[in-house]
């Protein structure tokens, strides 16, 4: 992989991680389409570090408020009285499903989708998931009431959205897409759904990055990959921050229809490409 490819993949990761169109699907499809080399462990760590930096930089004030309220609730023995404290508990509970699923299934999914084990079949599955979850998001847009605010978030909501987040281990589902979809079904307004999706994603992104980092510590970072590492971190962080800002503002006025159309169109195009490639 060269620096240009690293920058492109970093931009793709940063943009698609926070838009409901599946970052993992794009990171699988791009190297497959253009016959690029496998990014490798070190670069995967760079991408996770970049997107984690983006979401922490954007929501640092929210995180401080949530942390203060959470600890204050524990001290007063009223952990669910304050909405910010409830949000903190919802993030904790909502992070458990993805954590457990990742612990038990990550290696199997990684081998099939990311390490070439699934071949063209993995692309077909990814394409189908892009399409299916696009239709599910359309159903959420159509039937969700969209009146609830983030202050009304409860622990049950956190668990339901967390279960949806666990599905995003499968490329094509989209972590932000699945969590925003679940939140819309629960009646949350679009901006609130996106905001909770991003905050809930912090432990998931950090956990995935930590697992990859532990593996990298064992192997070490080769000197020739250091420039690629920095390029991946920087490009993913900058575009990730911009993607968060864009989507939160976009959803104040518009629906997710453009992303639904994109998901379905991309899935269909990929199915056609695979069919002709065989």
UniProtKB/Swiss-Prot annotation:
It comes from the Bacteria. The chain crosses the membrane at residues 14-34, 40-60, 89-109, 121-141, 153-173, 196-216, 227-247, 257-277. Keywords: Antibiotic resistance, Cell membrane, Cell shape, Cell wall biogenesis/degradation, Hydrolase, Membrane, Peptidoglycan synthesis, Transmembrane, Transmembrane helix. One of its GO terms (molecular function) is undecaprenyl-diphosphatase activity. The keyword Lyase does not apply. Coiled coil: none annotated. It catalyses: di-trans,octa-cis-undecaprenyl diphosphate + H2O = di-trans,octa-cis-undecaprenyl phosphate + phosphate + H(+). Disulfide bonds: none annotated. It is found in: Cell membrane. GO terms for biological process: cell wall organization; peptidoglycan biosynthetic process; regulation of cell shape; response to antibiotic. One of its GO terms (cellular component) is plasma membrane. It is a multi-pass membrane protein. The keyword Signal does not apply. Belongs to the UppP family. HAMAP family: Undec_diphosphatase. Bacitracin is thought to be involved in the inhibition of peptidoglycan synthesis by sequestering undecaprenyl diphosphate, thereby reducing the pool of lipid carrier available. This is Undecaprenyl-diphosphatase. It comes from Thermomicrobium roseum (strain ATCC 27502 / DSM 5159 / P-2). The gene is uppP.
